Amino acid sequence: MRHVYVGNFDYDTRHSDLERLFSKFGRVKRVDMKSGYAFVYFEDERDAEDAIRRTDNTTFGYGRRKLSVEWAKDFQGERGKPRDGKAVSNQRPTKTLFVINFDPIRTRERDMERHFEPYGKVLNVRMRRNFAFVQFATQEDATKALDSTHNSKLLDKVVSVEYALREAGEREDRYAGSRRRRSPSPVYRRRPSPDYTRRRSPEYDRYKGPAPYERRKSPDYGRRSSDYGRARARSPGYDRSRSPIQRARG
């Protein structure tokens, strides 16, 4: 059985995505995913060679990133699962563990907590789409859990456990939290009220208020009334023009 190294895929790439891709070239025994890279184990060495030749430097995933596929070197294999079956990591030990390869649909935070709490006090479990962070109270508990749970089964899935990069995990959470808390306030609370009062009230006063209506109507109505009054003023003249004739005939 030979295994190949796969790198440069999207961070949210799933275990099933890689298994589906490389199963096209032969029987895949297992896929061991790490943080940013993976090892794909083929039953036949010729299938592994064919997969390297046809997938290296090809685009993959939603981000259309170019894969890096090559034969796995001995030191790369030791970072995953050595012959004695224990986990080996060249990362600095932290209190937080990085967990992948679990079932993202069936696995809940409580399932993850039950899986790790026999090895120490679990302070926090943060689950994402297809990976999780498990934070322990002490460094000793985290190391004990890493040695005991790497390549263990969680809901019928063999999970991979490593030390988390503390800086990357904390920055992600702080950025996501601040973005959720602060983005609604300037858009919803600050903008609508001043725009509404400044834009609508002057137009309403200029076009719908009672003052312009009275200024437009009253002069016209007054002029028409004065003309009517002048028309009625001719009646005395009419009476005066007819009265001499009527007097003469009389």
Swiss-Prot record:
PROSITE patterns per UniProt: RRM
Compositionally biased residues, Basic and acidic residues: 192-230
Record-annotated disulphide pairs: none
A GO term, aspect molecular function: RNA binding
Composition bias type Basic residues, residue spans: 177-191
Highest taxon above the source species: Eukaryota
Chain ranges of the RRM domain: 2-74, 95-166
Intracellular or extracellular location(s): Nucleus speckle; Nucleus, Nucleoplasm
Region (Disordered): 170-250
UniProt main location, coarse: nucleus
UniProt-listed Pfam families: RRM_1
Keywords linked to the UniProt accession: mRNA processing, mRNA splicing, Nucleus, Phosphoprotein, Repeat, RNA-binding, Spliceosome
Subunit structure: Component of the spliceosome. Interacts with MOS14.
Note: The splicing pattern of the pre-mRNA is regulated in a tissue-specific manner and by development, and changes in response to various types of abiotic stresses.
Biological role stated in the UniProt entry: Probably involved in intron recognition and spliceosome assembly.
Similarity field: Belongs to the splicing factor SR family. RS subfamily.
Identification of the protein by name: Serine/arginine-rich splicing factor RS31A
Species, as recorded: Arabidopsis thaliana (Mouse-ear cress)
Gene from which the chain derives: RS31A
